[in-house]
Amino acid sequence: MNVTDYFDRARIINISSRKDRRVETVEEFARNGFPFDHDKVSFFKAVTPSEDDGFPSIGARGCFMSHLGILEEAIRLDVKNILILEDDIQFSRRISQYGQQAIESLQGMEWDIAYFGHPFEGDSSSPTWKAVDQPIHLSHFYAVNGKCITRL
């Protein structure tokens, strides 16, 4: 089972003006053997606000609103879980092996958010899940369990 197989939906945030990133993302999926099934795996049109409205930048607000939009969509669709990616995703060369291990471990545990894209500290030959109780500053590759979406 690959990483995308496990999730009800996978959404990739893409600014409509960045067609180059859209093409690169499709190629990245193909390189790693991930099917690009438009019912299950699809692009989400990034929110592009005109004002920062209290966020550090317009881009930060747009990023937040895009991720929030995907979570709201997941609630409407009543998904069991969702994988969220950004259009600059570059999978590890070990994604097949580590992705399968990650999915197998998720199937046997209670989880709310699984973050796949955080730099790993320590022995990267056998990655493990770590509980995190501090902010994570990147949001390019993570999953949310449907049972916790409304709490976010």
What label would you give each PLM region?
Residues 1-85, 89-152:
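An acidic/histidine-cluster motif and surrounding catalytic segment
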